[in-house]
Amino acid sequence: MIGRIRGLLVEKQAPEVLIDVSGVGYEIQMPLTSFYELPEIGLEAVVFTHFVVREDAQLLYGFISKQERALFRLLIKTNGVGPKLALTILSGMTAGEFVACVERDDIATLVKLPGVGKKTAERLLVEMRDKLKSLMEASVGSEREFMLQSNYTAPVVANTAEEDAIAALLSLGYKPAQASKAVSAVYVDGIDSESLIKSALKSML
């Protein structure tokens, strides 16, 4: 089990990052809520990971805190929720917002997330309610740790903020037309990719 990775952030293209650890590059998929908190390319980062082995692939999912990883692990135990949908849920809302949805029985907000239908939302509310109590108790005094040390500068591939934002939304399961419309609606000159993604996601929830 690979539970934690610390190394140089070499590539950063939502929702995936590449972290170099002693010459070995680890591709890690992250929810956008964690992705936003990463340092700039060329700096050192620490992420907590969940390792998945499938017949056709070995995948790493990364999180900025142990508590976010714990919530991800609870989500994928819910009937009908796999790692991809769990990432989509945690990309569309913070852990705190998800907990609030469960506490309020807020199906209307959950079904706005791509891939979450009414039945899945109902299962999430029922199955997660008791599980979240223990998680939130463990979250008291939680730490967010990532380190920013290095003079290394990695090459950056040029992409416009709009292209980055649309690509990120598509990776979460939104349709091309939905992604383009949402990004165009909130785009302003000079906005960076991460702010544009946040605004576009917020406009769809």
UniProtKB/Swiss-Prot annotation:
Residues 1-64 are annotated as: Domain I. It holds the Pfam family RuvA_C. Residues 157-205 are annotated as: Domain III. One of its GO terms (molecular function) is four-way junction DNA binding. GO terms for biological process: DNA recombination; DNA repair. Keywords: Cytoplasm, DNA damage, DNA recombination, DNA repair, DNA-binding. It comes from the Bacteria. Residues 144-156 are annotated as: Flexible linker. GO terms for cellular component: cytoplasm; Holliday junction helicase complex; Holliday junction resolvase complex. InterPro entries: DNA_helicase_Holl-junc_RuvA_I, Hlx-hairpin-Hlx_DNA-bd_motif, NA-bd_OB-fold, RuvA, RuvA_2-like, RuvA_C, RuvA_C_sf. The RuvA-RuvB-RuvC complex processes Holliday junction (HJ) DNA during genetic recombination and DNA repair, while the RuvA-RuvB complex plays an important role in the rescue of blocked DNA replication forks via replication fork reversal (RFR). RuvA specifically binds to HJ cruciform DNA, conferring on it an open structure. The RuvB hexamer acts as an ATP-dependent pump, pulling dsDNA into and through the RuvAB complex. HJ branch migration allows RuvC to scan DNA until it finds its consensus sequence, where it cleaves and resolves the cruciform DNA. This is Holliday junction branch migration complex subunit RuvA. It comes from Shewanella piezotolerans (strain WP3 / JCM 13877). The gene is ruvA.
